Curated annotation (Swiss-Prot):
It comes from Epstein-Barr virus (strain B95-8) (HHV-4). GO terms for biological process: viral process. It holds the Pfam family Herpes_capsid. The keyword Zinc does not apply. This is Small capsomere-interacting protein. Belongs to the herpesviridae small capsomere-interacting protein family. Transmembrane segments: none annotated. It is found in: Virion; Host nucleus. Keywords: Capsid protein, Host nucleus, Virion.
Length: 176
């Protein structure tokens, strides 16, 4: 028959019961200010419940998806801006007008420049073939931005086969 371990004696205080808890620094940020003691104790209990549930949820998300959800969203946006800049570099002509292409390329170019700053350390530590492909991608992206701005400056009104831009106010058109 297995012996049961005695239950630990809890004092009801996080810092005394769990001194190595990762919630302790956040929990100690709660200040009493001018609250009565009983109200502050209730606020501490509620805050501890909130911190515990938040911590458990973050662990669950990290176990399920591999990285925290917020970081995934940031990475996804950076990849989309780089992919958008690359798509503009590879598209010779599209259904968008040259002015729209220039605006899209300029907005994608700023996103690509912002996201390329953290990747310089990666490019320096990467193998030569990877770093050369990264630099060629950057060159293609900057070339696309320059080509799109040049096309916008030389716009003759041909339109490139695109649909006309609707300038009517949002609710002005009849519903069909």
């Amino acid at each position: 028959m297995a012996r049961r371990l005695p239950k630990p004696t809890l004092q009801g205080r996080l810092e005394a019961d769990f001194p190595d808890s990762p919630l302790l620094p956040k929990f100690q940020e709660l200040n009493q200010n001018n609250l009565p003691n009983d109200v502050f104790r209730e606020a501490q209990r509620s805050y501890l419940v909130f911190l515990t549930s938040q911590f458990c949820y973050e662990e669950y998300v990290q176990r399920t998806f591999g990285v925290p959800r917020r970081q995934r969203a940031i990475d996804k946006r950076q990849r989309a801006s780089v992919a958008g800049a690359g798509a503009h570099a590879h598209l010779g002509g599209s259904s968008a007008t040259p002015v729209q292409q220039a605006q899209a390329a300029a907005s994608a170019g700023t996103g690509a420049l912002a996201s390329s700053a953290p990747s310089t350390a990666v490019a320096q530590s990467a193998t030569p073939s990877v770093s050369s492909s990264i630099s060629s991608l950057r060159a293609a992206t900057s070339g696309a931005t320059a080509a799109a701005s040049a096309a916008a400056a030389v716009d003759t009104g041909s339109g490139g086969g695109g649909q006309p831009h609707d300038t009517a106010p949002r609710g002005a058109r009849k519903k069909q």
